[in-house]
Curated annotation (Swiss-Prot):
Reactions performed catalytically: a secondary aliphatic amine + O2 + H2O = a primary amine + an aldehyde + H2O2; (R)-adrenaline + O2 + H2O = (R)-3,4-dihydroxymandelaldehyde + methylamine + H2O2; a primary methyl amine + O2 + H2O = an aldehyde + H2O2 + NH4(+); benzylamine + O2 + H2O = benzaldehyde + H2O2 + NH4(+)
UniProt source species: Cavia porcellus (Guinea pig)
Residues recorded with modification N6-acetyllysine: K52
Protein name: Amine oxidase [flavin-containing] B
Entries under Pfam families matching the protein: Amino_oxidase (PF01593)
Family membership: Belongs to the flavin monoamine oxidase family.
């Protein structure tokens, strides 16, 4: 016997549950089918006596992420600021350099020009890319055929900014520079507010976390929906050839609906059989957008000893020998459960996954002791980690990335409906895609597409702006006059050559006027 409803939502992460909540609040009968034994998708809050609670998946929120902040507030959740009071550390070539601000400073004048030009150039290129249609950028084809490795080599004159740009790609996208399309990268950074916003803690994407963990968002929506959320129900078959759409799960339950919302990573669409088959371009798209590789690691200590040394816990670590490339303070807001969270990303995640959990912890502690200059780092009291590459119902983390050539060929089909199937998931968002904010935007947009299809709202209400959060207001990202107008290294060299030529001509003219040149 089939279970009947108005809408089946495939996927019980934040995007699917945000869609289900909006549809439920609009009076529709909705069922959510989640493959795992818990909701949350790529967010997961672990609870035990050693950690109280810890986010092993998506966790951070900040200014301009207004949808997730609004939804969390509706659900009764509060945020707290991630510690960013003390100094950060940039560890490079075996030495630690304290700094403040979003980016480590460059003391070499030539390197400073190169660093500054890298961030300004990437932000300027991003301004040419439409957030809702990156394939329409004037130079979309050229940029999409280029890897980020090629773009960094093209922009950077010196090695230091090239290496830091590589770390930036590894950290933000959990992929290697040769794996990622320059167009997709530039779009991704642009729709997150630019290079400074995406990398910053204060006034950036990592400013805050949720008290009690981000997993509560999905859990509280599940509590509102009750038995409409079905766990351990992997969807394996969707048939929309009849009057209703039939959705079958791995345990052979069949749900009959008017519409379906797919709120899973695009690549997981390959686990579902469709009748009729997906259109050609959509069918090929889902096999061409892999997810990144990351192991999230949290080391606990008896106290936040790094703060005594005037360090906030943020470490930017360069070098192939270092297991993690970025850390942050993960101590609870009341100062309890002192911890440092680190990210093993991209090829390092694939490499270090071969080690045991104990071996990874040892490497982390040895690295932290070296970077922080403290043997206290060698004395952890507890350790938790999550290898997202192992998750068959995620495929990786944080998000799907687009290899070269894919965005311009297939990008326009990412959220295009297929019959009575609509597509959500953070990858389909146009603002903070890859984050919890993007998940909410995508889920609510897909829900409004369904509401439009049944005649409840007009088409022009599908996409809706979001008012700025009163509790977490955004400050503008500013640059100095010098940062905006400094030349690149090649520009400086051209200026020097031009100045030299002009000076030589002027001296020659002056000498001739004064009769100092020999007459032949």
């Amino acid at each position: 016997m089939n279970s009947k409803c108005d809408v089946v939502v495939v996927g019980g992460g934040i995007s699917g549950l945000a869609a289900a909540k909006l549809l439920h609040d609009s009076g529709l009968n909705v069922v959510v089918l989640e493959a795992r034994d818990c909701v949350g998708g790529r967010t997961y809050t672990l609870r035990n006596q050693n950690v109280k609670y810890v986010d092993l998946g998506g966790a951070y929120v900040g200014p301009t992420q207004n949808r997730i902040l609004r939804l969390a507030k509706e659900l009764g959740l509060e945020t707290y600021r991630v510690n960013d009071v003390e100094r950060q550390i940039h560890h490079v070539k075996g030495k630690s350099y304290p700094f403040r601000g979003p980016f480590p400073p460059a003391w070499n004048p030539i390197s400073y020009l190169d660093h500054n030009n890298l961030w300004r150039t990437m932000d300027d290129m991003g301004k040419e890319i439409p957030s809702d249609a990156p394939w329409k950028a004037p130079l979309a084809e050229e940029w999409d055929h280029m890897t980020m490795k090629e773009l960094l080599n093209k922009i950077c004159w010196t090695n230091c900014p090239r290496q830091f740009g590589t770390l930036f790609v590894n950290l933000c996208f959990t992929a290697e520079t040769h794996e990622v399309s320059a167009l997709w990268f530039l779009w991704y950074v642009k729709q997150c507010g630019g290079t400074t916003r995406i990398i910053s803690t204060t006034n950036g994407g990592q400013e805050r976390k949720f008290v009690g963990g981000s997993g509560q968002i999905s859990e509280r929506i599940m509590n509102l929906l009750g038995d409409r959320v079905k766990l351990q129900r992997p969807v394996v078959y969707i048939d929309q050839t009849g009057e209703s759409v039939l959705v079958e799960t791995l345990n052979h339950e069949i749900y009959e609906a008017k519409y379906v919302i797919s709120a899973i990573p695009p690549a997981l669409g390959m686990k579902i059989h469709f009748k009729p088959p997906l259109p050609m371009m959509k069918n090929q798209l889902v096999s061409r957008v892999p997810l990144g590789s990351v192991i999230k690691c949290i080391v606990y200590y008896k106290d936040p000893f790094w703060r005594k040394k005037d360090f906030c816990g943020t470490m930017v670590i360069e070098g192939e020998e270092a297991p993690v490339l970025y850390t942050m303070d993960d101590t609870k807001p009341d100062g309890s459960y002192a911890a440092i969270i680190g990210f093993i990303a991209a090829h390092k995640a694939r490499k270090l996954a071969r080690l045991t959990k104990e071996e990874r912890l040892k490497k982390l502690c040895e690295l932290y002791a070296k970077v922080l200059g403290s043997k206290e780092a060698l004395k952890p009291v507890h350790y938790e980690e999550k290898n997202w590459c192992e998750e068959q119902y995620s495929g990786g983390c944080y998000t799907a990335y687009f290899p070269p050539g894919i965005m311009t060929q297939y990008g326009r089909f990412l959220r295009q409906p297929v019959g009575r199937i609509f597509f959500a998931g953070t990858e389909t968002a146009t603002h903070w895609s890859g984050y919890m904010e993007g998940a909410v935007e995508a889920g609510e947009r897909a829900a409004r597409e369904v509401l439009n299809a049944i005649g409840k709202i007009p088409e022009d209400e599908i996409w809706q702006p979001e008012p700025e959060s009163v509790d977490v207001p955004a400050q503008p990202i500013t640059t100095t006059f010098l940062e905006r107008h400094l030349p690149s290294v090649p520009g400086l060299l051209r200026l020097i050559r031009l100045t030299t030529v002009v000076s030589a001509v002027a001296l020659g003219f002056l000498a001739q006027k004064r009769g100092l040149l020999l007459r032949i």
